[in-house]
Amino acid sequence: MAASTMALSSSSFAGKAVKLSPSSSEITGNGKVTMRKTASKAKPVSSSSPWYGPNRVKYLGPFSGESPSYLTGEFPGDYGWDTAGLSADPETFAKNRELEVIHCRWAMLGALGCVFPELLARNGVKFGEAVWFKGGSQIFSQGGLDYLGNPSLVHAQSILAIWACQVVLMGAVEGYRVAGEPLGEVVDPLYPGGSFDPLGLAEDPEAFAELKVKEIKNGRLAMFSMFGFFVQAIVTGKGPLENLADHLADPVNNNAWAYATNFVPGK
């Protein structure tokens, strides 16, 4: 079949020959043509939004200076700061945007997973080891790891089996996010909607644009939080809530500076 030059924008045409673009159709071996939506251009955000456009909030407020020409305020989380020029190349910028958003989402889930079990344990809920890095390490113990402290749920004794399950489950979700099959079609892999938006939060363009900003801001904070949790685990051997309680009880002796000056690796 000749190369296609025009994408379909509607599913019904009368008396008009239309060629299908390669990105909008796939020809199977039995001659069937399967259709797939192409990403439509997002509706422009209102010029009154403080998070988008040339007059958006900048990283240093009124002292920010002029932003790079390629940072136009089109995307959420663009505060006009890129001293290393990481976003100068459009393809690299698009790739880094996707990586950041995905890592933000995992970091938010991870931060919640680190804090919530410890919070429950401090309020009398008993389900085994509550400190995030100690709980996972129980899989290497002789008795293995019981999810939520209940052997009737999941009794894990093999790190390889857990790894395989994670690959399958996470791979299935990522496959749907990117490709959309078999559960449906995906217009934008970064914001797939559909089954990923059961509450319909993205139906209003203005609200959706603001939610994107909130997501990226909270996600960046969560990534820094996870880094802090890792450092705390290495230095103090305690969970984040216990470290917070220690700091509030004695801020002079329990702070980052005090631990940094007294920390000896391996002890």
From Swiss-Prot:
Residue sites binding chlorophyll b 5 per the record: 166, 263
GO cellular component term of the entry, any: photosystem I
Residues annotated for chlorophyll b 1 binding in this entry: 59
Molecular function in Gene Ontology: chlorophyll binding; metal ion binding
Cofactor-binding details, from the entry: Binds at least 14 chlorophylls (8 Chl-a and 6 Chl-b) and carotenoids such as lutein and neoxanthin.
Topology class, membrane: Multi-pass membrane protein
Binding site for chlorophyll a 1: 81, 87, 100, 220
Residues involved in chlorophyll a 2 binding: 103
Top-level taxon: Eukaryota
TM annotation in the entry: 101-121, 153-173, 221-241
Function, in words: The light-harvesting complex (LHC) functions as a light receptor, it captures and delivers excitation energy to photosystems with which it is closely associated.
Residue range of the transit peptide in the UniProt record, numbered on this chain: 1-35
Main location: plastid
Subunit description: The LHC complex consists of chlorophyll a-b binding proteins.
Residues given in the record as chlorophyll a 6 binding sites: 247, 256
Residue sites binding chlorophyll b 4 per the record: 166, 177
Gene that produces this protein: CABC
Protein's name in the database: Chlorophyll a-b binding protein C, chloroplastic
Binding residue positions for chlorophyll b 3: 158, 174
Free-text comment about domains: The N-terminus of the protein extends into the stroma where it is involved with adhesion of granal membranes and post-translational modifications; both are believed to mediate the distribution of excitation energy between photosystems I and II.
UniProt keyword terms in alphabetical order: Acetylation, Chlorophyll, Chloroplast, Chromophore, Magnesium, Membrane, Metal-binding, Phosphoprotein, Photosynthesis, Photosystem I, Photosystem II, Plastid, Thylakoid, Transit peptide, Transmembrane, Transmembrane helix
GO biological processes: photosynthesis, light harvesting
InterPro entries, per database record: Chloro_AB-bd_pln (IPR001344), Chloroa_b-bind (IPR022796)
Amino acids binding chlorophyll a 3: 138, 148, 215
Species for this entry: Nicotiana plumbaginifolia
Positions contributing to chlorophyll a 5 binding: 214, 232
Residue(s) carrying N2-acetylarginine: 36
